[in-house]
């Protein structure tokens, strides 16, 4: 008996083709005939067969079966009726067996879902289904079936609607479609449904700029935002990760469709803050990843990242991240600034930027030093150092404000960070000083005086903090850099003061013998390039340099440092010092030290040792004489 119905469907198909009767009448009879099969699986396959053999015989526009009596509405009505009955059979399948095989039945239902979905595909292919028919007839009747309270059916049908019908129809019927979302069962994966809808709409908007006014006309953003809020309110048990995923999709839609509307972007972030307000710090790793995706989206979209970062709700979202994730997000922000070669050009922008990366420039929790991974910490601080190098403004006064702002923040970061963050600050300030050469006095009406003397004073105080960390070798190098910059600015007292501080640091803090050798050669090399000092100051400094050279731990080191001091008394510049007598004294002194070193080697090793030092001294004699 069951096979006869398949035969009747085939006969009906041939009868329509013969055109001896109206197509709508035959289709109506076939649909009614299928009602006699109420077994869910048998009924589904029978109606699926009916849909398959009749799809090319529908009275569509341009079809050979269209006529005065056969219209597009007849075709639509037939497909919708068949779809409705198939969906009812499909939903009923879940009640066809005992509870113990419920899982098996759900699996079977999932495998048979495409039989139902084919009807919607057929509807989307009917040429005569324009926007009006879709809005007034098709969508309401399909949504009636979505309201069946069955989780699997609701998810699948909503997904089918979004996938098979044109983007233009979705845009123009957005309010109707979104109105069904809060009515879905709490277990329905609504975030995936809405995400796919927003993806389709954003791709549609990207396909042609001419379409964008339509999005504004239908207020797509407002409707999507409202729908998401209603869904989150209706599904009180929705996990945080689900809610945040919805906001990520909405933000992606906003950035693609309304990239110029920063207020929309901030509104999405604000809605996310509201949802997170009951969770001071996120502990769900999946939710945390979604938050990172949410915060990363504006960075990827806008070329002027600093402007994007001024969104008022951006830092409020970051406040809900744990310390580890906050650092990850801070690194992403810095990496984007580096990648886009963005210049942070004002102190106000810098303050906002530092507020966002505060996880890298200070401790956010009570984590002990022992818990920090040394390599990770170095990488983080190097990121901050690179950011400091990106701070620039052509206006000297504004650049000075930037430097003062940087100093304030990095000094609050604790001693461990200073060796990484102070050097870029110093070099950035020295660039400004070279730009300000020749200026003196305060800038009228400014809280931040942009003059070389004042900035040198600031650097002296900053390096002093670094030397107390302790990081004496780094501090000494920076003192010498500042001394050289003061020399270029013709500021003798300032340069002398930096050298004095370098010598004090060398004597009191540099204890390692290898570090002492490196330090004294740096001092000698820097002092040799100085041309700002008068006779008295230069004599004082050169005397200290030669004295410390002769006091190094190892004789070979003493010898090399002393003959290096000879360059302090003979400078090849036109106006440079040329004191041959003192050059000779240095070389003779180094020769005595070399002799002592060889005698010591003879005593300890029983041999005179290599003559390397004598060859090096000979080279110096040849150079000078």
Labelled PLM ranges:
Residues 338-624:
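Extended, charge-rich low-complexity regions and/or helical-solenoid scaffolds
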């Amino acid at each position: 008996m069951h096979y006869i119905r398949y035969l009747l469907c085939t006969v009906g198909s041939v009868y329509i083709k013969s055109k001896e009767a109206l197509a709508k009448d035959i289709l109506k009879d076939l649909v009614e005939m299928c009602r006699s099969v109420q077994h869910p699986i048998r009924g589904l396959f029978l109606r699926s067969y009916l849909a398959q053999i009749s799809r090319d015989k529908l009275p569509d526009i341009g079809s050979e079966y269209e006529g005065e009596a056969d219209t597009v509405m007849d075709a639509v009505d037939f497909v919708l009726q068949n779809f409705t009955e198939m969906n009812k059979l499909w939903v009923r399948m879940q009640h066809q067996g005992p509870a113990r095989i419920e899982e098996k039945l759900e699996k079977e239902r999932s495998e048979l879902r495409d039989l139902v979905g084919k009807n919607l595909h057929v509807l989307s292919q009917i040429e005569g289904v324009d926007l009006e028919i879709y809005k007034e007839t098709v969508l309401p009747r399909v949504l009636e079936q979505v309201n069946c309270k069955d989780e699997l059916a609701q998810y699948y049908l909503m997904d089918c609607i979004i996938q098979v019908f044109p983007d233009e129809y979705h845009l123009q019927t957005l309010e109707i479609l979104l109105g069904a979302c809060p009515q879905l069962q709490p277990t329905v994966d609504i975030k995936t449904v809405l995400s796919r809808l927003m993806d389709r709409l954003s791709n549609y908007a990207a396909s042609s700029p001419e379409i964008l006014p339509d999005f504004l006309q239908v207020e797509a953003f407002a409707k999507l935002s409202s729908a998401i809020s209603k869904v989150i309110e209706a599904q009180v048990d929705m996990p945080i990760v689900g809610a945040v995923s919805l906001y990520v999709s909405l933000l992606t839609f906003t950035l693609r469709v309304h990239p110029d509307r920063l207020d929309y972007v901030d509104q999405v972030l604000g809605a996310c803050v509201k949802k997170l307000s009951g969770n001071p710090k996120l502990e769900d790793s999946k939710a945390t990843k979604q938050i990172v995706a949410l915060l990363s989206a504006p960075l990827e979209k806008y070329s002027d990242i600093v402007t994007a970062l001024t969104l008022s709700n951006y830092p409020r979202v970051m406040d809900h991240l744990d310390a580890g994730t906050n650092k990850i997000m801070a690194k992403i922000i810095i990496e984007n600034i580096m990648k886009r070669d963005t210049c942070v050009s004002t102190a106000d922008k810098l303050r906002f930027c530092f507020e966002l990366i505060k996880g890298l420039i200070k401790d956010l929790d009570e984590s002990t030093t022992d818990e920090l991974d040394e390599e990770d910490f170095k990488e983080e601080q190097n990121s901050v150092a690179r950011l400091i190098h990106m701070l620039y403004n052509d206006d000297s006064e504004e650049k000075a404000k930037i430097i003062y702002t940087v100093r304030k923040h990095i000094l609050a970061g604790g001693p461990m960070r200073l060796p990484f963050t102070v050097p870029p600050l110093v070099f950035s300030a020295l660039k400004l000083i070279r730009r300000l050469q020749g200026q003196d006095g305060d800038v009228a009406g400014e809280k931040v005086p942009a003059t070389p003397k004042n900035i040198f004073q600031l650097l002296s105080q900053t390096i002093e903090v670094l030397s107390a960390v302790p990081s004496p070798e780094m501090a000494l190098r920076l003192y010498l850099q500042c001394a050289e910059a003061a020399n270029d600015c013709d500021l003798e007292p300032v340069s002398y003061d930096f050298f004095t501080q370098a010598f004090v640091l060398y004597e009191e803090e540099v204890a390692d013998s290898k570090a002492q050798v490196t330090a004294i050669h740096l001092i000698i090399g820097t002092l040799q390039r100085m041309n700002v000092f008068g006779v008295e100051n230069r004599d004082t400094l050169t005397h200290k340099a030669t004295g410390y050279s002769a006091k190094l731990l190892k004789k070979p080191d003493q010898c090399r440092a002393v003959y290096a001091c000879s360059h302090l008394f003979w400078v090849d510049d036109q106006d440079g010092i040329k004191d041959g007598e003192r050059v000779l004294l240095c070389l003779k002194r180094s020769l005595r030290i070399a002799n002592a070193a060889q005698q010591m080697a003879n005593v300890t090793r029983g041999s005179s040792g290599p003559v390397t030092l004598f060859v090096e001294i000979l080279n110096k004699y040849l150079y000078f004489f």
